[in-house]
């Protein structure tokens, strides 16, 4: 089967934003206008096509990224293939955003025209910066009370430090929003309300907006000619670029992430969506426009690149595992190079296991079509993979490569969970393991002392939804404990410890002596190990045992048994015995050595500090600040945003449970907040004593 669409006609993009900026509605409109959805789904009646898990339809938020393939005819009359990923905007699900950005070529960042740049907008923007994803901006909800396009443009500069290139100006705002001015063509598009947004009239720019349109077109040209010397020279000599040249320069600057073209409209009222789709074709990259994917040779560890080309060896990245009620486990993968055929065998280079592709599916939200072959640039769902997890590389077994892996955040909250009936114990274990395979930011472990099952995640909502999915998808009812904070421990001063491990029973004994300096790691929260052994006092082959021994006890600190962060260990001396020494003996010695040293190294308890932003009407500012202070919060600042005030604070996670209920009653339901993990900080001594007493009793 030959490729149906040329790779330069592909656009792989996602839609990213703050919760409630209208992502799912915008995606719905895109699917409607590109002919994939016959009935427009509204989020508030629970019918949106992309939100296909039951919980999403109930809560009106998008939880998992659903991948959809659809098609659009550009301004040149040529059909393009769109692979769209809908991403969640709730902070508990930033992992979903992160993994979809990793496999996309471009993105549309959505803003709520009333709120502008919100806290979660900043979070997803930073994630997109990390992967250098070209972005366009769509200022949505222009029909909303308080909508202010120009303030949103300013906030992109002040809050994101980014350059927005304004491509359209709104005609009217709030309930008077009628259409947009196209600053390239210099005409106005007015939508016909009765046509569900399918039709619009191209008219002259309204008289009262002509001067503003001229001013913004001038700004647009000034910004885009800066990226091209010849265009800049021509412009300085008084020669304006023509419309095609402007589009070409906007495309180049967008793909090079120099600036971000900005559009406006209202997806809910069906205005502005089609020009946005034309802009996806005009300005977002095809797989050929982005740098080749980097990886390392599976055998030699040499750096290699794979290009978006069907003729190159197959390489793809598994970016999501999903449980499908009809097909079972589905692995979503982005093909970077080569071709994939149904039934073929691929190598998982991370696990060093071969996998057979049973079925290959093209997904449209939650409907699917079987395909026989897929090509470079495609995003496909694969059935039948047994060993593959998120972030694994799948490739041609004869040309193995390991692509750059994704980074996943550590969970900050945990709860104990048990099945309501004894018979469900096994089913619960199976369900939790399945859900953990789907979501790398969700962990399951068994508490060694109590035997309880502990689940950990990114927030209360995250764990609520896990428990809910267990009930719905796996029919397991569970009791959950109160949320527990994922505390950590560290050391605060340097100490030197000399420890000898000797064991003599009949036959071969055990002997190992180690002298180690332990100190806080100046480079961050990871564990760092160094050996400064000279002269062979500890033979080379035993040194990994020393490191392994220390690492094995870092999972349980001396104060209350929490994992330890930010420790550096330097092996400076030791001794061995020709017969009685072994890797195991050195492992045991270093383990005991660290346990002794940790008592003297000023162990300290750390707690997760959350970055909290509260958006509240002015009347409640005093109450909100007072309440945050009472939660040991540190107020970082406040700013006015329209008629609301935004309060930023760092607050310990331990004091933020059920905050949403307090905030609601304090503000009569008018204030909102977002919370993301910021850093670990020392716990004040009076609080630390309580925590130690509580947890030491459990250990």
From Swiss-Prot:
It is found in: Cytoplasm. SMART domains: EFG_C, EFG_IV. Residues 8-288 form the tr-type G domain. One of its GO terms (molecular function) is translation elongation factor activity. SUPFAM superfamilies: EF-G C-terminal domain-like, P-loop containing nucleoside triphosphate hydrolases, Ribosomal protein S5 domain 2-like, Translation proteins. GO terms for biological process: ribosome disassembly. Keywords: Cytoplasm, Elongation factor, GTP-binding, Nucleotide-binding, Protein biosynthesis. Its main location: cytoplasm. GTP binds at residues 17-24, 86-90, 140-143. Belongs to the TRAFAC class translation factor GTPase superfamily. Classic translation factor GTPase family. EF-G/EF-2 subfamily. NCBIfam families: EF-G, PRK12740.1-5, small_GTP. This is Elongation factor G.
